[in-house]
Amino acid sequence: MGDASDAGLPVKRRVGPDGIHLFDRRTGLNVLFDEVDVPETQWTRAPRQVSIALTNACDLACPFCYAPKAAAMLDADRLCAWADELNAEGCLGIGFGGGEPTLYRRLPQVCRHVAEHTSLAVTMTTHAHRFTPRLIDALAGAVNFVRVSVDGVGPIYEELRGRPFVELVQRLTWIGRAFRFGLNCVVNLRTLPDLDAVSDLAATTGAEELLLLPERPARGRPGSSPNVVAALHQWITDYRGPVALTLGAGDSGSLPIAQPLPSETGLRTYAHIDASGTLRRSSYHSTGEPVDERGVLAALERLQQKDVA
Ligand code: SF4
């Protein structure tokens, strides 16, 4: 279990049904002592990872966006308090998203608080177009991993994201000099033919990871068809590139994927807090529990009980 005394240390310890798990936020190294049988009463209470939508605001208009469009933004002091609580309860990392997290004015201050007062890894999902040398300086050392949304190259990228591809490549070069980073790719009929080019882009820019995200149904769009998902799985099977591939939970189908912590499931693994402060099982779930003055863990327990009832 994590505790307040480990604040600021890079290596985090977490215990659960799979054993004792050590995590180093600087390198992303995970070590699991699975021969240790830990009684359930000692299991870590917090989810392993929590994503937080800082704001619903975004300056792009991607056709497949499922982020809520109602104006909402989290208070920075609440965010810091939640990070402290999650850290003390054994969470390993928080991922800031949105909307677009770089539109959140106090992003550098919140990231620095987490870096200096907790052992949580900070990740961020961004379209990257607001990464300037100044913002990079403000975030350097306070963000452990940056996930950049890239669903195609050249004209397909520009059609979907509405920004010059050459500017994206410039931002990736800057980001790669300051942070470990990966690419997130929404896969649908339009982007599927660009997967080779996106994986080449990941390799040439120094990305460590390519996260493949079959498009989810949202706002009248049906999401990726079974044929697209089957073609994606075939592409993954044939892939021989140097960049590690990852898939979102529930997207692996019959693919043989590594499951290092098979017994840690559901809310033990992951939870999402939206920009209005509601804790949900994921950003795709429409219902949840508000995080009030009792904190994140109290909301988590209410959500668990609600699901049991
Ligand atoms: S960049 Fe992300 S949040 Fe913004 S419109 Fe596109 S998908 Fe939505």
PLM features: residue spans?
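Juxtamembrane/interface motifs at transmembrane-helix termini
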Residues: 86, 190, 300-302
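Conserved alpha-helical substructure of the radical SAM core
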Residues: 13-14, 24, 29-126, 130-137, ...
